């Protein structure tokens, strides 16, 4: 993230078309990545993971799995966080243009999103991410009014925390899977009652199940806060530089970002094809 001058208010409240397009792509892509959660049982998922890790799948199936991961894995979720940051920066600039207080007004939005996310988690789906975005918004909103150097420092801290957490999870998973065969759903204490207890399982049982294991199901939502914050700050930076919103702004920076994606992003994603 390079230093930039203070944010200037948006000249007009017109729709930002590139922002709308990116937001639509991010939402559609995230839906495409996560739709299997609603269509595949834990038993099928565990069986597929076991076949994948133990080399049971044929070469074509393994290639298709790697190609799908190459195109989808993490990319739309990252885009969604970046677009969220772009939206926050646009709201901040419009608040400046109108002389409105910041971040007081946005904090009310974030608290409302946190409440909606909590309701969604309890009554609908245990993998809710709205609460994560609400917490990130509460952290990022005051940062948008700070100098670019302060935002860059927070970006680096958040990125470092994200990398450390990712490495810790990777090491833990490697040791866990090396200790024996792939775990089955009934081996997970949070899933044990769900998949092994006899008798009907109703909606009220589902609510109780989520509340009893709230820390288990919220661990990922908490763990992705640093990485999401870093991407949100990237989105805000993209708006400030004008690299996406103004075609003629900063062509050199746009070219550097394009090369960065080709030289680092593309090869790192291609590692998914390795056995």
PLM segments and residue spans:
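Internal alpha-helical transmembrane segments
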Residues: 90, 94, 100-169
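Solvent-exposed interhelical
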Residues: 103, 139-154, 237-260
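C-terminal TM-helix exit segments that contain a strictly Trp-centered aromatic cap at the helix terminus
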Residues: 33-37, 164-176, 267-274
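Specific transmembrane alpha-helix
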Residues: 78-93, 131-144, 223-246
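Hydrophobic alpha-helical transmembrane segments of integral membrane proteins
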Residues: 17-22, 27, 71-74, 78-82, ...
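Alpha-helical transmembrane segments and their helix-start/interface "positive-inside/aromatic belt" motifs
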Residues: 13-31, 148-160, 251-260
């Amino acid at each position: 993230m390079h230093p930039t001058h203070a944010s200037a208010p948006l000249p007009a409240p017109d729709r930002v078309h590139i922002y709308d397009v990116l937001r639509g792509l991010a939402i559609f892509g995230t839906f495409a990545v996560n739709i299997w959660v609603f269509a595949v049982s834990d038993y099928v998922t565990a069986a597929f993971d076991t076949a994948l890790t133990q080399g049971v799948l044929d070469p074509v199936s393994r290639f298709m799995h790697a190609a799908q991961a190459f195109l989808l894995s993490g990319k739309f979720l990252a885009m969604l966080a970046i677009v969220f940051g772009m939206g926050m920066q646009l709201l901040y600039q419009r608040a400046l243009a109108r002389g409105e207080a910041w971040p007081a007004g946005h904090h009310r939005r974030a608290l409302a999103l946190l409440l909606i996310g909590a309701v969604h988690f309890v009554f609908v789906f245990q993998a809710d991410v709205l609460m994560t975005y609400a917490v990130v918004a509460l952290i990022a909103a005051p940062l948008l009014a700070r100098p670019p150097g302060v935002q860059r420092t927070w970006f680096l801290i958040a990125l470092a925390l994200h990398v450390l957490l990712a490495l810790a999870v990777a090491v833990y998973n490697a040791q866990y899977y090396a200790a024996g065969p792939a775990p089955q759903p009934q081996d997970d204490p949070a899933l044990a009652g769900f998949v092994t207890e006899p008798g009907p399982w109703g909606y009220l049982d589902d609510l109780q199940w989520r509340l009893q294991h709230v820390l288990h199901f919220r661990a990922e939502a908490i763990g992705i806060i640093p990485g999401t914050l870093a991407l949100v700050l990237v989105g805000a930076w993209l708006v400030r530089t004008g690299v996406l919103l103004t075609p003629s702004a900063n062509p050199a920076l746009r070219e550097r970002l394009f090369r960065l994606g080709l030289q680092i992003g593309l090869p790192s994603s291609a590692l998914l094809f390795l056995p």
